[in-house]
């Protein structure tokens, strides 16, 4: 017995003894790792001393979502305006204008989107709308948002429309202007009916040369104030996951003769179609077709260099531009000071921190862009300018340039771009790597992916299966109460039939629910809305507060570049 107890005690003590002898070594295998794979990480930050304020006037003025008209004057940026131009293209089913057509009316309608104002109380002011005929077609080569739009000086509406910022926009054109479209349809209508691919290019060109479209602008405020109005451009809306035609169209009504009978007939025109579409075919296939308006912007604020503040406005107005050469110079110096080689250095993270001070009027924060996206500006050999984003939108860890109200700053990441900048040696003479900040807005988009024909066929199949089950089995014999046909029998008009019916309808309902309208939120470049943001410039002397975690305590709240990099161990 004593021997058994002694053995048990020894066995119990053995794990303790074994564990007491275990040591963890972090050095084992160290000499087996390739030394070229070992890096030392460092984090440095430095103030950004040079920031240009440049107009983004070569952004394209074309928009496929809305038209923008209005004007705002504020004490910081002066006057900024929005005006819009677009074509009016006949829908496919409106081309037979009959004989001897007589003008009755020509009206245009747009649903309201949103408004932008510089100060409260301006949302419902009256604005005069001036509508002119375009004198030339809209160029697809010169697309800068600040470019002039050729238009006439004669008003083409009945009277001067007045808009109060509340409801949809409705315009009524003069008889003289409507007659131009009647004449165009009389001359070109018969040959425009064929809209097969490849056959309409010359027809469309002939049409827009005859009636290029319209141009809309508003009066400008004499003092501080004003409003910018946005209207939905698309003739397509989404309901139950299917596209349908809304009322964003122009309607030409004429009294004309068909087969000897005089009738009042309306003809539809789609704003901004870039070609002749077969709209009915698109709707049958539940496919969206695109429309475009050219939204022009003008600005008074001059370009210059940021000193105590950085000014950001909407449209093609002032945007901050940070020279890449400046960033590279500071980072290369930091790498060399730590014994590294810039060509072999890995950039782990690079962030541009742009702080701002809380304005006295907190409503001003609503005029800050929700996001300023870092981009680069590239010019092709033919002079075409394009902008490319620098943050990875698919990476949730990357800061896209969102407005951070808690830390009172924007802090977008440009990690991959900085890695490329380190390899450049020509930045003293080239500016294609300079960082431009553009205003971005979150847009909620309704998506239509349903197929009406497939759903109808599925419903038909379900009913066919149900009725086959209902009547194909005869009376179903005796069962329960009565003769199965109406009682609780088996496999007839009893539980079996109803059960199948409801199961099938449940499946059909499930399919239908899968085709309900879905919504997605996307980040899109916003050239239309009014923005007014004042950020801290390089000359600011305000010190950081403990509540702001992006900058070190007591650091100056100036634009700052923070970069984490790794250099190979020696």
Question: What does each model-found stretch correspond to?
Answer:
Residues 2-15, 21-570:
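Secreted, disulfide-rich extracellular signaling modules
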């Amino acid at each position: 017995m004593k021997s058994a107890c002694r053995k048990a005690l020894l066995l119990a003590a053995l794990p303790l003894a074994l564990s007491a002898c275990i040591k963890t070594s972090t050095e084992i295998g160290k000499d087996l790792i390739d030394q070229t794979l070992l890096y030392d990480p460092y984090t440095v930050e430095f103030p950004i001393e040079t920031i240009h304020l440049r107009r983004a006037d070569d952004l394209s003025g074309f928009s496929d979502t809305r038209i923008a008209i209005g004007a705002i004057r504020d004490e910081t940026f002066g006057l900024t305006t929005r005006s819009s131009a677009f074509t009016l293209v006949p829908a496919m089913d409106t081309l037979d204008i009959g004989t001897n057509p007589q003008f009755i009316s020509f009206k245009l309608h747009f649903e309201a989107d949103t408004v932008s104002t510089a100060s409260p109380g301006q949302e419902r002011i009256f604005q005069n709308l001036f509508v002119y005929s375009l004198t030339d077609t809209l160029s697809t080569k010169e697309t800068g948002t600040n470019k002039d739009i050729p238009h006439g000086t004669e008003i083409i509406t009945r009277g001067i429309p007045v808009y109060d910022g509340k409801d949809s926009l409705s315009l009524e054109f003069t008889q003289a202007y409507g007659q131009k479209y009647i004449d165009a349809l009389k001359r070109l209508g018969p040959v425009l009916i064929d809209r097969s691919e490849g056959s309409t290019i010359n027809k469309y060109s002939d049409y827009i040369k005859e009636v290029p479209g319209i141009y809309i602008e508003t009066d400008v405020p004499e003092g501080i104030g004003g409003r910018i109005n946005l209207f939905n451009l698309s003739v397509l809306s989404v309901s139950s996951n299917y596209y349908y035609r809304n009322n964003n169209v122009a309607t030409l009504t004429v009294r004309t003769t068909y087969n000897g009978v005089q009738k009042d007939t309306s003809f539809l025109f789609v704003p901004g179609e870039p070609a002749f579409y077969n709209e009915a075919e698109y709707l049958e296939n539940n496919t969206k077709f695109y429309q475009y308006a050219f939204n022009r912007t003008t600005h008074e604020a001059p370009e210059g260099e940021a000193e105590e503040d950085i000014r950001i406005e909407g449209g093609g107005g002032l945007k901050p531009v940070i020279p890449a050469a400046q960033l590279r110079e500071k980072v290369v110096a930091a790498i060399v000071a730590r014994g590294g080689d810039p060509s072999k250095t890995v950039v782990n993270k690079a962030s541009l921190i742009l702080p701002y001070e809380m304005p006295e009027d907190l409503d001003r924060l609503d005029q800050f862009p929700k996001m300023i996206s870092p981009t680069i500006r590239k010019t092709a050999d033919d002079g075409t300018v394009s902008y490319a984003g620098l943050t990875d939108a698919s990476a949730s860890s990357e800061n896209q340039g969102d407005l951070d109200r808690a830390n009172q700053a924007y802090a977008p990441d440009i990690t991959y771009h900085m890695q490329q900048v380190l390899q450049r040696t020509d930045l003293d003479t080239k500016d294609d790597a300079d960082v431009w900040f553009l205003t971005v807005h979150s847009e909620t988009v309704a998506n239509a992916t349903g197929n009406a024909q497939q759903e109808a066929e599925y419903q038909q199949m379900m009913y066919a299966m149900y009725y086959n089950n209902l009547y194909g089995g005869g009376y179903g014999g005796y069962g329960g109460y009565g003769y199965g046909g109406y009682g609780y029998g088996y496999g007839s008009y009893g539980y079996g039939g109803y059960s199948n019916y409801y199961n099938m309808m449940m499946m059909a309902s499930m399919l239908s629910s899968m085709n309900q309208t879905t919504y997605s939120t996307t980040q899109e470049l916003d050239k239309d809305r009014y923005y007014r943001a004042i950020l801290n410039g390089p000359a600011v002397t305000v010190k950081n507060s403990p509540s702001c975690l992006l900058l070190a305590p007591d650091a100056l709240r100036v634009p700052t570049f923070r970069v984490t990099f790794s250099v190979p161990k020696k």
